C-alpha cells in the first residue's frame, strides 16, 4: 500500500472511522446489511461507520426519525466519497480498518468512483453462493487479515479450502420488524410458514421443503 494515495479521516469526537465498502439500501441484501450496520453503530462510543459507496435519501425506506439519522451518516461519509474522486488511478489506501464486501470467488466490490480500496487492515466480508473457490479466489484470500463469513456454512466452505483466518458473524433479527403480534385474519384456519430468499444451494430450500413435508403430515392445516 506504500505506493498508493492514502486517505485519512480525522474526527473531532475522537471516534475511529470503520469504513465498509458495499452499498446502503432498502432494496437488496447487501444494502440492508449496510443500512443496519450504520444504524446499530451510530452511537458506538469508539467507532463511527463510514460507507465507501455513495447513497442518498431515495435509496432507503425508513421512518422519519431513522431516515434523518441515515442522512446525517451519509453526510459523514461524503468527505470520503469526495476524497476518492480526487485520487488518481483505480486504487486507494485507507489509514483505517476496512470491511471489504466480497462476491463469489472472493472478488472485491469497488467503492465510490470505482476505486479498489486497501485498509489498515482489510477485513473481508462474504456471503458465498457456491461451495468451490478457484485458485485465483484462494490467492485473493491472502490479501485479508480476516474474512468474516455470513453463515457457518460459508465459514466451513472457506476452511475446507485451507483458509483459517475466518470467523462467522450472523446478522441476527430485527425484532422491531419480526415479533409476535395479533393475527391479521389472512388465511383463516391455516398455519402459514414463510420461507424467503432466492433459490440457491446456500439458502437450504431443499431442507425447508423436507421439513415442511414432515410438518404437514402431522398438521394438515399448514400452508
Identify the residue ranges that each predicted region occupies.
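Extended catalytic core of nucleotide-activated donor transferases of GT-like folds
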Residues: 2-8, 19, 62-157
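Acidic anion/phosphate-binding donor-loop and adjacent secondary structure
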Residues: 135-136, 173-189
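A conserved nucleotide-sugar
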Residues: 48, 209-223
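A short, glycine/small-residue-rich beta-strand->loop->alpha-helix junction that serves as a flexible
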Residues: 22-33, 203
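Donor nucleotide-sugar binding/catalytic pocket of nucleotide-sugar-dependent glycosyltransferases
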Residues: 145-156, 163-180
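N-terminal strand-loop element at the rim of the active site
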Residues: 25-27, 38-85
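Short hydrophobic "strand-cap" motifs at the C-terminus of beta-strands
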Residues: 21-22, 125, 150, 169, ...
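Conserved donor-binding/catalytic core segment of Leloir-type glycosyltransferases
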Residues: 19, 186-203, 209-212
Amino acid at each position: 500500500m506504500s505506493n498508493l494515495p492514502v486517505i485519512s479521516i480525522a474526527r473531532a469526537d475522537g471516534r475511529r472511522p470503520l469504513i465498509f465498502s458495499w452499498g446502503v439500501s432498502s432494496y437488496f441484501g447487501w444494502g440492508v446489511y449496510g443500512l443496519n450496520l450504520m444504524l446499530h453503530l451510530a452511537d458506538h462510543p469508539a467507532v463511527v461507520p463510514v460507507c465507501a459507496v455513495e447513497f442518498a435519501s431515495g435509496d432507503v425506506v425508513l421512518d422519519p426519525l431513522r431516515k434523518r439519522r441515515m442522512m446525517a451518516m451519509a453526510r459523514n461519509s461524503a468527505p470520503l466519497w469526495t476524497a476518492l474522486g480526487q485520487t488518481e488511478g483505480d486504487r486507494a489506501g485507507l489509514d483505517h480498518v476496512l470491511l471489504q464486501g466480497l462476491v463469489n470467488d472472493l472478488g472485491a466490490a469497488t467503492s465510490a468512483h470505482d476505486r479498489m480500496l486497501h485498509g489498515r487492515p482489510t477485513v473481508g466480508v462474504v456471503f458465498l453462493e457456491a461451495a468451490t473457490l478457484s485458485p485465483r479466489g484462494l490467492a485473493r484470500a491472502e490479501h485479508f487479515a480476516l474474512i468474516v463469513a455470513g453463515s457457518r456454512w460459508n465459514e466451513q466452505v472457506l476452511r475446507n479450502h485451507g483458509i483459517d483466518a475466518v470467523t462467522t458473524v450472523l446478522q441476527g433479527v430485527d425484532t422491531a420488524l419480526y415479533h409476535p403480534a395479533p393475527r391479521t385474519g389472512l388465511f383463516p384456519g391455516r398455519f402459514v410458514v414463510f420461507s424467503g430468499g432466492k433459490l440457491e444451494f446456500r439458502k437450504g430450500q431443499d431442507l425447508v421443503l423436507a421439513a415442511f413435508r414432515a410438518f404437514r403430515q402431522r398438521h394438515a392445516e399448514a400452508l
